[in-house]
């Protein structure tokens, strides 16, 4: 449930840049337009070269026909006059004698510098294009010169029509490309539109329903990734809501009891009020302190849980042997009547120092809580393979029934027998959270299967690597064990590191 009123979210603002759909359409149009322009230039150049080459071939053929027929020598006037019935202009020049011409209506065969050079005998042949004609001049063997020209207007008319055809076809191609690009883009971006609508729906309404996935392309994978994000967000919100609800429920009981005791103390100290007996006053104050301690523990556990849920951890190399030592020292301050049998190796885990320390502390606290006075708790950290080690914390308590072993790691779960003991029901939940966040595994077994009591052993599998063993002067190989006594109790510490004995 929400404790605070949720403020309305501002609608998402549209960006001023072009949409992806329009950009894809413009890209398709640009590419097609570029191809059309290049193809049009190529087609125009090829056809133009072919038409003008054909005109040159026609002029050359007509000249060769006149020369080969011998008519220019036998009857030049009649030969030149015969060309008037075709589509060419002709001129035969006999220097110092005569000039014969035959021209099409409205046309004049142009005589320029190139043609004059042929007539003077300076050139054997020339070709050139004037304003609207193609002119061929050839020097004959008898000293005369033959000039033939053809109008370019029909060719230019064809090229002009070709330009219009290419322009129209290119425009149609660009338009078709734009329409096709728009249709393809619309179909291709439909999943993106669904993702956008889903994101806006989440922002407006907190609706975390998954989006249907169609196909198996990149957009389908993007949709699946978005659905995974929605599921993770839904699970996170569910955890937050459950944590807030459970915390409110768990805090209500100690707060109510604390309030009652404080009110009773204040009432007994009011002027004229009857005084409580001294022993009852002492017990009442002790209850208040115990309830404050219980609240502090509960709040600390809640902070650790929320910190783990939010992923606010710093990963660094952690020596689990040091973690076990520090945690053991704290537990023994609270339970100096318990004997701890410790066997550890140097094992490095890349993870959160605070979280791993809290995990080890909670396991030892739980084992000590269920152990009778003077009992033994075993703590063993051993290597299983090159990349995994196992931390085992064992007690000789009443054990955990098989049907409850999965439940004890749930938040605020407390069995019927555990409700009479101090605790928040969050200790093993924190252990589970830390272990899973570090890629580990958990399991529970009986310490003494079939025994009475069977006891409980919690196994934690942790990935990592073996710590390098420093070579100390006078060190000998092999494990050493020592029983160390101090003012608060004893612990049997077995160090597999062979160089030192860990005193706790």
From Swiss-Prot:
<dbReference type="GO" id="GO:0005524">
    <property type="term" value="F:ATP binding"/>
</dbReference>
<keyword id="KW-0547">Nucleotide-binding</keyword>
<dbReference type="InterPro" id="IPR003660">
    <property type="entry name" value="HAMP_dom"/>
</dbReference>
<keyword id="KW-0346">Stress response</keyword>
<dbReference type="Pfam" id="PF00512">
    <property type="entry name" value="HisKA"/>
</dbReference>
<keyword id="KW-0464">Manganese</keyword>
<dbReference type="InterPro" id="IPR050980">
    <property type="entry name" value="2C_sensor_his_kinase"/>
</dbReference>
<dbReference type="InterPro" id="IPR036097">
    <property type="entry name" value="HisK_dim/P_sf"/>
</dbReference>
<feature type="transmembrane region" description="Helical">
    <location>
        <begin position="164"/>
        <end position="184"/>
    </location>
</feature>
<feature type="domain" description="Histidine kinase">
    <location>
        <begin position="246"/>
        <end position="466"/>
    </location>
</feature>
<feature type="topological domain" description="Cytoplasmic">
    <location>
        <begin position="185"/>
        <end position="504"/>
    </location>
</feature>
<keyword id="KW-0418">Kinase</keyword>
<dbReference type="GO" id="GO:0005886">
    <property type="term" value="C:plasma membrane"/>
</dbReference>
<dbReference type="InterPro" id="IPR004358">
    <property type="entry name" value="Sig_transdc_His_kin-like_C"/>
</dbReference>
<feature type="domain" description="HAMP">
    <location>
        <begin position="186"/>
        <end position="238"/>
    </location>
</feature>
<dbReference type="InterPro" id="IPR005467">
    <property type="entry name" value="His_kinase_dom"/>
</dbReference>
<keyword id="KW-1133">Transmembrane helix</keyword>
<keyword id="KW-0808">Transferase</keyword>
<feature type="topological domain" description="Cytoplasmic">
    <location>
        <begin position="1"/>
        <end position="26"/>
    </location>
</feature>
<keyword id="KW-0843">Virulence</keyword>
<keyword id="KW-0378">Hydrolase</keyword>
<feature type="region of interest" description="Disordered">
    <location>
        <begin position="471"/>
        <end position="504"/>
    </location>
</feature>
<feature type="topological domain" description="Extracellular">
    <location>
        <begin position="48"/>
        <end position="163"/>
    </location>
</feature>
<protein>
    <recommendedName>
        <fullName>Signal transduction histidine-protein kinase/phosphatase MprB</fullName>
        <ecNumber>2.7.13.3</ecNumber>
        <ecNumber>3.1.3.-</ecNumber>
    </recommendedName>
</protein>
<feature type="compositionally biased region" description="Polar residues">
    <location>
        <begin position="487"/>
        <end position="504"/>
    </location>
</feature>
<keyword id="KW-0067">ATP-binding</keyword>
<dbReference type="GO" id="GO:0004721">
    <property type="term" value="F:phosphoprotein phosphatase activity"/>
</dbReference>
<dbReference type="Pfam" id="PF00672">
    <property type="entry name" value="HAMP"/>
</dbReference>
<feature type="modified residue" description="Phosphohistidine; by autocatalysis">
    <location>
        <position position="249"/>
    </location>
</feature>
<dbReference type="InterPro" id="IPR036890">
    <property type="entry name" value="HATPase_C_sf"/>
</dbReference>
<keyword id="KW-0904">Protein phosphatase</keyword>
<keyword id="KW-0472">Membrane</keyword>
<keyword id="KW-0812">Transmembrane</keyword>
<feature type="transmembrane region" description="Helical">
    <location>
        <begin position="27"/>
        <end position="47"/>
    </location>
</feature>
<dbReference type="InterPro" id="IPR003661">
    <property type="entry name" value="HisK_dim/P_dom"/>
</dbReference>
<keyword id="KW-0902">Two-component regulatory system</keyword>
<dbReference type="Pfam" id="PF02518">
    <property type="entry name" value="HATPase_c"/>
</dbReference>
<dbReference type="GO" id="GO:0000155">
    <property type="term" value="F:phosphorelay sensor kinase activity"/>
</dbReference>
<keyword id="KW-0460">Magnesium</keyword>
<keyword id="KW-1003">Cell membrane</keyword>
<comment type="function">
    <text>Member of the two-component regulatory system MprB/MprA which contributes to maintaining a balance among several systems involved in stress resistance and is required for establishment and maintenance of persistent infection in the host. In response to environmental signals MprB acts both as a membrane-associated protein kinase that undergoes autophosphorylation and subsequently transfers the phosphate to MprA, and a protein phosphatase that dephosphorylates phospho-MprA. MprB/MprA up-regulates expression of mprA and pepD.</text>
</comment>
<keyword id="KW-0597">Phosphoprotein</keyword>
